[in-house]
Amino acid sequence: MQLFHTILAGFLRRNPTFSGLCGVLLVAITLIGSPARGADEPAPAAGLAVAPSAADAPKDVAPAEAPRPPGGAAVEMPQSPPMTPVPIGYIREVLDHPRPSSRMDIEPDDAGIAGAKMALDENNAGGQFTGDLYSLDAKTVASPNAAVEALQKFYDSGHHFIIVDASTDTLLKLSDWAKGKDILLFNIRATDVSLRQENCRANVMHVVPDRYMLADALAQYLVIEKWTNWLLVHGTTPGDLAYVEAIRRAAGRFGANIVDQREYKDVSGGRRDDVGVIPPGKQASADEAFAAEPEYQVIIVADEDQLFGPYMPYRGGSEPRPVAGTTGLVATTWSPGHEKWGATQANNHFQKDYKRLMLPIDYQGYVAARTVGEAVTRNQGADFAMVAAFVHGDELQLAPFKGIKQQYRPWDRQLRQPLLIATDKVPVSMSPQRGFPHASHADIDMDTLGIDEPESKCKM
């Protein structure tokens, strides 16, 4: 009886989910194995196992010894095996962005980190059965050099898997320092295409989509809806201009037409008073001065810092047109309004735990941490070489609430993933769209988003 109690208690420590059932079993078995009670003795309270008192023990009987095998040695009681620690690092760089036009676009302090923590809950739910214990350690830094120092400290303390929420330059510095070491970085912020092309790195996995993927996903939807004539309005930051290049590429790939392109120049201090009006196009000749504005069906906005874009749906010109791009209808990894494939439960869980809505950067942190958890579980261990090989290979199958298994492309380490086409309230579609089959593999339509293997300049 004592041996059974010990085994059952050990199982209960490792599997608290079954605590209710185990408690009932312990009570029942204790009652069955106890001496019969007198009529005047009170029964034990429901749900409590009552140990027999000293008075209940037979007189002049020696205490029971642990069972012994035929050889005479005492049987060792089973013990729970030690848990294997799987620490995950998180480096968050404070980026110097201009204040957006709306305070609602300011990210909370735990953006990204909260998503990774939610993934750790899932990792540890499975880890209690596999013997793995996951933890997340986050460091906030203010410069690339400080980020490298944080990475070094993580590595010295046994962290091999690092989630990076930082700029392109910082990510490259981290990758260079980590070269030749047992470190795998997960990029959840930087969308620069160069990180997947000439500046690709074997030790960097890209969870966040690049600008080509975002532009392609949006373009496919607009073309399917037959909104093929676009007016392109953009800011002047390097990010805005890079998004312009991605939009022009997507238009050429999927059959859209950019009828005009106009630049918005932000005047410091003036955008609170008069902002969002489409700037005039290039200077027209005398013969063109009275020509009508070009016909366009959609205004595409390239304004990654949200300086003027949010005004465009309502102050975009004399003719009302839908707005898409970096504001209005956007391509994104996540929406708080997403409700399919378990997304409702994910959003509810996140909102309950963190008292706010789940943002795309949170989702990206979640996927990064779940990648580690899935790889460790499937490999039945946290050996770095085995886990890294699994993440790089084609056996990884992530299922993060989009109805299709996801993995990383072998040629540039970019996560293959569907992208939501969403407003600030609800998703309206998901790309890739039907009607854009892959050139060589009809069943791999996700590779119609972003850089396909024949286009890749990545050499790792």
Explain the meaning of each model-derived region.
Residues 8, 30-33:
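Residues marking helix boundaries in flexible regions
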Residues 20-31:
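Bacterial N-terminal signal peptides
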Residues 10, 18-21, 457:
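The N-terminal extracellular segments of secreted preproproteins, especially immediately downstream
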Residues 2-4, 26, 38-460:
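Extracytosolic ligand-binding ectodomains
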Residues 1-16:
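N-terminal secretory signal peptides that target proteins for export/translocation
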